[in-house]
Amino acid sequence: MSQYAAELCKLLITDNFGELYAPLPRIVQNTRLSPRQVRHGLAVLIQQRLIYHYTSLDDGIAYYEASWMTAYNLVRSGRILQLVEEKLGKYVAKVLSTILYHGHVRISYLETLPELRPQVSSKAGKLVAANGLNGIHSDEEEEEEDAHVTDQGEQEEYASGRPENSVDSDYGKRSASQLHPALRSLAAYGYIMRVRDAHFQSPADLVEDAERAVSSRSDVRGLKGKKFQEAIDAGVETYIKEKTDGTIPQGPLAGALPRGIKRRAGQLATNSSSKRVKLEHLPEGDEDIDDDDFYGDDYVDGDNTLMDPNMIISVNYQKFEVALRNRRLARLAEQCTSRVTSQVYEALLGRIELKTPACRKQPERVPEGEENEQYSVAIPLHTILDDIDPDLDLSESMAGVDPANLLSNGHMGLNGDGNGDDDDDESTGASTGIWNRRRNRVYELEQHLSLLAQEPNIFSTRSMQSGMITWAVEFRHLARRLRHLEIERIIESRFGTIAVRVIRVLAAKGKLDEKRLQEISLMASKELRQVLARMEAAGFVDLQEVPRDAQRQPSRTMYLWFFDLDRVARMVLEDTYKCMSRCLQRIGVERNKLKLFLEKTERTDVKGNEEKYLSPAELKTLKEWRDKEALLLGEVGRLDELVSVLRDY
C-alpha cells in the first residue's frame, strides 16, 4: 500500500465515519477516549469491513490489519448507486444504499427499517409510509386511493378515529413483498453476497489457515518434493474458494441464469420497453414468461419466496467492477462504431456480466505482455437477439441492402417465396413473414457483431460451438487497450500530439536509439530531443546507457529510449491517489470556512425550505458552496474512473 493510497483511505474513512483510525494506544492517548469507547469504534470499523481481524490459535492474541481496498471503495458509492438505480429502480437503489451504510447487515434487520417500507395510500387521501411519514404520490396512486375512499364521513372517521401514523396490518407484508424481490434482484445480478467468516480475515491469514488445513490431510502428507507443493497449491486455492464463496443461491435455477432479471427502460438511449433477459436453460414444464409487472417505477419479481431472514449480506464490489468495466467498454465501442452497434455490444456484455464473477482471476495485476488471453463465456447469437430491444432499428447505421439478397445463406428474405405455392392461407403467410423478419434481424445483428470484431479494437470474437454461432469477449486485450488510451490521453494533454506519436513508436518497437527513433517517427532531431527531455523529466520515458566497451566513455556508449507502461501506470496511479486526496482535503477546508453557515442549512427545519429561512445573500453563498462541492466531487469521480482502468480492469 503506497503513501498516497493510505492518505486517501484515511480521508475517506474520516469523511464517512469520523477520526477513528490509528493504533489503539495512540487513539486512547490522543483522543482521551476510554478503552471501552475505542473498542466500540473498532467494532464500527469491523462492521464496515474496513479492517481485518484474526485471533491466533497459539497465543490467543487478536491481530488487526487495514482493508484499504474496502476503504477505497467508499469513493465509488455514488457510481454504484447510480448504476443500480438505472438498472433496477429507485427502491432497489435505496436498499443497496442501506446495505452500503451498514457495511454488512442481516436481512431480518432490513425488514425493520422504516425507510425501506413502501409508501402506501391511506384513506385520508395522503400517502403514508409504513413508518407513518407522509410522502409524495403519483397520479396513478391518487386514482387508486380515490377508488378506496367511499364517502367523506369515512374519511373523517379515519382521520379522527385512527392516528395518522398508523397503518393497516398488511403493510408489513407489503414491505416484505417489496424488500425481498429487491434483494433477489440484487442477488441475481451478483451485486450482493452472503458474508462468510473468512471475509473478515486478511488474505495472508486465510492462506496460512488454508496451508495448515491442506497439509494436515492424509492424502497430502505422504507426498514429497514437487508433487507435495502442487498438491498444496491446488488445495489452498480450493479451500479459499470454498471459504470465501458468497454466492446467494437462486433456488432451483441456481445453476442457470436467474429468473426475473429485467432490463430497465433507461438502460438504452432509445425509448425501449422493459424486457426480461430470457433463460437459456429452463427445466421441463417451466415457461419463460415475460412478466413486466412493476411496483411503481421499480422492479418487483413475481416470485413471493422470502429470503432467509438470518442471512448476513454485504455489497459485492468485485461484481460492480465488472459492471463498471462493461459500461466503459460500451462507451468505447460507441466512440469507435455507432450508437446502435454500441447498444448491441451492451446487450452482449450484459449477458456476459451475469456469468462473470470478477474482472480478473487473480487479485494482483500481471505485468504488461505477460497476461494470458481471458475469454468470457460464449453467448449464442439467438440469446443476444432476444435481449435486444425489439424496437431498436438495427439497419439504421448499416449501408442500404437489397431485401431480396439480404440472406446470403439461402434463407428467403422479406419478399422471398417459401414453397412456390401462391394459395397459402393468411395465417401461414403471417407466420412466414414473422420468421423472415427474424431471419433478417439475425443477419443485421451478426453484421453489427462482425463490425465489433474488426481490428484494432476486437471488441468481440466469433466462434462455433456444437454447430451454433456464439460470441465472446477477450477482456485482457481490451483492458490493455483502455490503459494505453488513458496513458496516451494524459501524455497528449501534457506534451502534445507529437509525444503520443513517440510513445506509440516506443511501445511498438521497444528500445530505440535517437537516430532510429527519428527515422520511424519522421520528426526533426531538435524537436524530438525536446519532447524526449520533457517526458523523461516527468517520468514517462526512460533512457538506458549501453557501453560498447569496458571504458564506458560517452562517445562509445549507446543511449536507448524505451517506454515502460507498467511503471508509468504505477506512477500515474500514485499521482491520481494524491490528486483525489487533495480534492477531499480542499472540500474539508472549504467546509470549515462555512462551518456555522452549513450547520444552519442542515437543520431539519431549514433543509428543503432554504428560500423561506435564508436571505438572498445566504442563498447565493449556499449555491456557490454546492457548485464548488459538486465540481470537486465530480473531479474525484473522474479520477476514480482512471484508477479503475489502471488498477482494476
From Swiss-Prot:
Chain spans, region Leucine-zipper: 576-597
User: What are the subcellular locations of this protein?
Assistant: Nucleus
User: Which superkingdom heads the taxonomic lineage of this protein's source?
Assistant: Eukaryota
* Keywords in alphabetical order: DNA-directed RNA polymerase, Nucleus, Transcription, Zinc
Q: List this protein's GO terms for biological process.
A: DNA-templated transcription
Q: Report a single Gene Ontology molecular function.
A: single-stranded DNA binding
Q: Name one GO cellular component term.
A: RNA polymerase III complex
Among InterPro entries, the record links this protein to:
POLR3C_WHD, RNA_pol_III_RPC82-rel_HTH, RNA_pol_III_Rpc82_C, RPC3, WH-like_DNA-bd_sf, WH_DNA-bd_sf
Residues in a coiled coil are: none
Q: Where is this region: Disordered?
A: 135-176, 266-293, 409-432
Role noted for this protein: DNA-dependent RNA polymerase catalyzes the transcription of DNA into RNA using the four ribonucleoside triphosphates as substrates. Specific core component of RNA polymerase III which synthesizes small RNAs, such as 5S rRNA and tRNAs.
Spell out the subunit comment.
Component of the RNA polymerase III (Pol III) complex consisting of 17 subunits.
Family the UniProt entry places it in: Belongs to the RNA polymerase beta chain family.
How is this protein named in the record? DNA-directed RNA polymerase III subunit rpc3
Q: What is the scientific name of the source organism?
A: Ajellomyces capsulatus (strain NAm1 / WU24)
